[in-house]
Amino acid sequence: MDFALDKKYEMAQNLFREFAQNEVKPLAQEIDEQHRFPRETVEKMAKYGFLGIPVSKELGGQGCDILTYAMCVEELSKVCGTTGVIVSAHTSLCVDPIVTFGTPAQKEKYVPDLASGKKLGAFGLTEPGAGTDAQGQQTKAVLDGDEWVLNGSKCFITNGKEADVYIVIAVTGIVEKRGRKMKEISAFIVEKGTPGFTFGTKENKMGICGSSTYELIFTDCRIPKDALLGQKGKGFNIAMHTLDGGRIGIAAQALGIAEGALETTVNYVKERKQFGRSIAQFQNTQFVLADLATKIEAAKLLVYKAARKKDEYQSGAKVSYSVEAAMAKLYAAEVAMEVTTKCVQLHGGYGYIKEYDVERMMRDAKITEIYEGTSEVQRMVISANLLK
């Protein structure tokens, strides 16, 4: 197996890294402290084509693969976890399901504007009583003539109030499967500004504070009949497919956060002096850094493998990338939490001060163990595959 990256990946990586250092890093502390969505950064990313990386050129995207997209999220997240998740939620959770399951008319209507960054996307699955458990969904969609009527709410929605296009999962009936009555789940495309669609609570979060995380509320919200995404009753499959891809994005985010924390800590320990010498000369420091670097490299291999596996799938190969995505997300997220925690420790008291990036990075890392399926859910996915 060749682990070397082709020249095209190195060029893309350098572009993402340069943009992150010049355009994202200078604002990272400010947007965290002010809990401010970085609209100006999103507009710049749109000009660079970062919001349509894996979308075909025919639909207005860059025509690149999932690995290139993962590298973009990784490099952005090295300096700002917020910016990384904005791109991930937009691309994996909104653009991808429309490209994969949308009708030609839906693709033509929505994808070019999303891929160009003219519009931003979001995904509404989670509810107060339903996340991983799709059967716990309470949001309902009832067909009334030529319109669907949505009622219910969604919570913890990334890109919440800033998005323009939303994929919304709702109950469309009751069906019987294997002798059991179950909720029929369907997916819909909903636009901001639709009457009956409003925003509720803005979440005051521990980390990724610049991310717009809102409650979505639907009160007799009428959307066209053709807003149904995919087939009626196939919403669960669409949601699971979407989360599989989303896990690659979050794994890349976690990887980037871990890499950023290690990089800033290596620079810090070289300069920090104790007992007449830099703490980089202490064996304890060296061993901690060695362990963290090794785990980061292992996480990177898992993330890149999952991205390549999805590329194979999208090229028409009869393969699944669900387990690879779960493994990458599980391991990268837990590594990010370990790396950032130990990097704070190596900073000593300064690691607890907001002026130092590792403090923010540790707070940002925690959410990667939670959204797009908790670490426990990833273990369920992996073990189910082993035991089938």
Where are the language model's segments positioned?
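Helix-loop "lid/cap" segments that line or gate small-molecule binding pockets
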Residues: 92-100
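A short, Trp-centered hydrophobic/proline-enriched beta-strand micro-motif
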Residues: 117-125, 169
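Flexible, small-/acidic-enriched active-site or ligand-binding loops
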Residues: 136, 193-224
